[in-house]
Curated annotation (Swiss-Prot):
GO terms for biological process: mitochondrial translation. GO terms for cellular component: mitochondrial small ribosomal subunit; mitochondrion. The lineage of its organism: Eukaryota, Fungi, Dikarya, Ascomycota, Taphrinomycotina. Component of the mitochondrial ribosome (mitoribosome), a dedicated translation machinery responsible for the synthesis of mitochondrial genome-encoded proteins, including at least some of the essential transmembrane subunits of the mitochondrial respiratory chain. The mitoribosomes are attached to the mitochondrial inner membrane and translation products are cotranslationally integrated into the membrane. It comes from the Eukaryota. Component of the mitochondrial small ribosomal subunit (mt-SSU). Mature yeast 74S mitochondrial ribosomes consist of a small (37S) and a large (54S) subunit. The 37S small subunit contains a 15S ribosomal RNA (15S mt-rRNA) and at least 32 different proteins. The 54S large subunit contains a 21S rRNA (21S mt-rRNA) and at least 45 different proteins. It is found in: Mitochondrion. It comes from Schizosaccharomyces pombe (strain 972 / ATCC 24843). This is Small ribosomal subunit protein uS8m. One of its GO terms (molecular function) is structural constituent of ribosome. Keywords: Mitochondrion, Ribonucleoprotein, Ribosomal protein. Belongs to the universal ribosomal protein uS8 family.
Length: 152
């Protein structure tokens, strides 16, 4: 699963105090990064190639799709990473699908089935039929889905 690669790559990039991180350019990764950006964990998202962000916008075609990357600006506060950790909740061997009411309990910090609830200042990210979104947006829209990860 490509998202698990992104989780570990982001954590390693933050720990190495990098200013930019490069991740594969695909729709699911872009949606995940957009949620992280809106939640304040990333400072920017840019498209580019394997050498760096594009200076001028470049269209992705069949000829260049293998070299296209997303370049993420990593955010720090007083020299410390804003993102402390990003952990997978659903795994290929164990999917965690929750209903809207179970998502609400999970967001309140209560244990749902075999998954511990969110801690204070932790953000849950959910894959719904409308795409990847934060747990707050899923609850507002009364959507259930697959809990992908938790971020703090």
């Amino acid at each position: 699963m490509q998202l698990h690669y992104v989780f570990s790559h982001l954590q390693n990039s933050f720990r190495a105090r990098k200013s930019l991180a490069s991740v594969p350019n695909c729709n699911s990764v872009l949606e995940l990064c957009a949620v992280l950006y809106h939640q304040g964990f990333l400072s920017s998202i840019q498209r580019g190639d394997i050498h760096g962000p594009d200076a001028l916008p470049t269209i992705t075609t069949r000829q260049n799709v293998a070299t296209r990357r997303l370049w993420l600006g990593l955010k720090y506060f007083e020299g410390k990473p804003v993102l402390h950790y990003i952990r997978a909740v659903s795994k290929p061997s164990r999917k965690v699908n929750l209903t809207p009411s179970e998502l609400l309990q999970f967001a309140k910090g209560r244990k749902v089935s075999f998954v511990n609830g969110l801690e204070p200042a932790e953000v849950g990210i959910v894959e719904t039929k409308h795409g990847i979104m934060s747990i707050d947006d899923a609850i507002k829209n009364n959507l259930g889905g697959n809990v992908i990860c938790r971020v703090k």
